[in-house]
Amino acid sequence: GSEIQPR
């Protein structure tokens, strides 16, 4: 799946 990457 996709991982959340907070920028």
Curated annotation (Swiss-Prot):
Gene Ontology molecular function: any one: signaling receptor binding
Top-rank lineage group of the source organism: Bacteria
Any one Gene Ontology BP term: killing of cells of another organism
Keywords assigned by UniProt, alphabetized: Antibiotic, Antimicrobial, Bacteriocin, Lantibiotic
Function: Lanthionine-containing peptide antibiotic (lantibiotic). Active on Gram-positive bacteria.
Official protein name in the record: Lantibiotic carnocin-UI49
Species for this entry: Carnobacterium sp. (strain UI49)
